[in-house]
Amino acid sequence: MTSIGQLRSQVASKERSAVEVARQYLERAERLDTEVHAFLRLTPERALAAAEAVDAKIARGEDPGLLAGVPVAVKDNLCMVGIPTTCASKILENYRPPYESTVTRRLEEQGALIIGKTNLDEFAMGSSTENSAFGPTRNPWDLGRVPGGSSGGSAAAVAACEAVASLGSDTGGSIRQPASFCGVVGLKPTYGLVSRYGLIAFASSLDQIGPFTRTVEDAALVLQAIAGHDPLDSTSLAVNVPDYRQALISDLKGVKVGFVKEFFAEGLDPDVADAVFEAIEVMRDLGAQIQEVSCPRFARGLSTYYIIATSEASANLARYDGVKYGLRDREADALVPMYGRTREEGFGSEVKRRIMLGTYALSAGYYDAYYLKAQKVRTLIKQDYLDAFAKVDVLVGPTAPTTAFAFGDKVSDPLSMYLSDIYTIPLNLAGVAGASIPCGFDAKGLPIGFQIMANALEEGKLLRAAYAYEQATEWHKRTPALAAEALTR
C-alpha cells in the first residue's frame, strides 16, 4: 500500500496525476465496498474537482499541499456543503449541510481528495457500527465480524485500502477501538487540538476528530494538516502546532514508559494480553525505561462516562424535532405529537436508550446524585492521568479487551458492548491524547491493538513512541486478503 509521502511525491513529480489517483481509488472503493460497506456514499465530483485543482497547482509550479493527491474518506458526521451528512440516522437521511467542517476544508487546502463519506454507528453511539440505519460495515479481516465503532466505516476503508487515510471522531474510543479491530493506526488528539466545527455533536466535552492511517508517519501528516486553532470553535485551543514529523525517531532511549496495571485485570483476552506484553518488551529493547503505573479510579471510568456522555447527548439531540431540518412526521395533527412521532421514527434503539439515560441523569432530583457526581469523579480520573504523566512520558496498554467479535454477539447485551471501550474511555474523560497501533494477531487471525497515551498537547511524545515501535515490527505491513487481491489488479 502506498504511503502518503510516496503518493504525494509521485503526484508532485508528475509521475502520476492527482486525477488518475482519484479515479483509481474511487473505482477500487466502488468494487470492494460491495463486500465491506465502509462508505455510505462516494463523492466522485468533489474528489475529481479537488484532483484537478492539485494538478493545476503543480502545473503552475505552486506548492500543492502536504496531502497533495491523497485519497481520504471522512466519517458521515462531518459536514460538507451540499453533500448528504446523515450521521447514519434516518432523522438526517436527506440533510445537506449549508456549511463546511473545518477539518474537511483544511484537508482540501492541503491537497487531499475526499472520495466519500463513511458509515458509523448512528450519531456515533456504538462500538460495532451495527447501529447504522443503513446497514453494518464488515471487518475486512473477517467479513463475519464487526469493524468496531463508532467510526467503523473509516477504519474499514483504510484497512481495505479503499482510502489512504480517513477521519473519524472519538468520544469514548470511537477511533482507537475500530483501529484495533481493523489493524490500522488510529489517533485521538488532545481535546481542543483539532476543531470540532462542522462535527455533528454527540457529547461536546468529549468529542474529538482524528485520523486513521496505515502508518504512524501518515497519521502525523494528517494531524499536521487538520490541527490548530479555529475561531469558529470556542473549545479550540490557541496553541502553535509543532512539526510532528520531527518527533518520528526510531529509538526510545531515555523515554519513560508506564504500563497501567489496572488495564491488565480480569476481562482481558489472553491473546491480547500476550501481544501487548510483547510490545512492551520491544519498547524495552529500543531503550525505553519501563515501569508499572496505577490509575486507581480506572474502574469508575465507564459509569462516569455513560452519565456524562448520555446527558450531553440528550441535550444535543433535542434539536432534532422535525421543525427546521431533517425528518418530519407528516401525519401528526399538532406540534407536540409531531415532535414525538418524528423522534420515534427517526432515531434508532441505541440512540433512544442513551437519550433516556441522559434525560434521567439530568432530571430534577437526580442531577446531583448522577450528573454532578460524575463530573466530580471525572476530575479525579483526570488527576490520575496527570499524576501518571508526572512520572512517565507515555502510558501503554491494550486498546480493547478482545479482538473483533461476530455480528450479533453483543447487540442484546448493551453492557457487554459498552465494555468494549473500557480502556479507551478514560482518555476522553481526561482530555489527553491516545493512539492505537497494530501489535499482533490472535489465534483466529484477527488484529490486536496496542494503545499508547500521552499527556495533553504531547502528541510528539506519543508519535515518537508509536513510530519507534512500528519501525521495529512488521505488523503494520499486513493487509487483509481482499485488499491484497485488489492491490494486484
UniProtKB/Swiss-Prot annotation:
Q: Which reaction does it catalyse?
A: L-glutamyl-tRNA(Gln) + L-glutamine + ATP + H2O = L-glutaminyl-tRNA(Gln) + L-glutamate + ADP + phosphate + H(+)
Q: Can you supply one Gene Ontology CC term for this chain's record? A: glutamyl-tRNA(Gln) amidotransferase complex
Q: What is the superkingdom listed in this entry's lineage?
A: Bacteria
What InterPro entries does the record point to? Amidase (IPR000120), Amidase_CS (IPR020556), Amidase_dom (IPR023631), AS_sf (IPR036928), GatA (IPR004412)
User: Does the keyword field hold ATP-binding?
Assistant: yes
Question: Known EC number(s)?
Answer: 6.3.5.7
Q: What is this protein called?
A: Glutamyl-tRNA(Gln) amidotransferase subunit A
Q: Give the residue spans that cross the bilayer.
A: none
Keyword hit for Metal-binding: no
* Family recorded in the similarity comment: Belongs to the amidase family. GatA subfamily.
Complex and partners = Heterotrimer of A, B and C subunits.
PROSITE patterns xrefs: AMIDASES (PS00571)
Q: Which organism is it from?
A: Gloeobacter violaceus (strain ATCC 29082 / PCC 7421)
Active site annotated at which positions? K75 (charge relay system), S150 (charge relay system), S174 (acyl-ester intermediate)
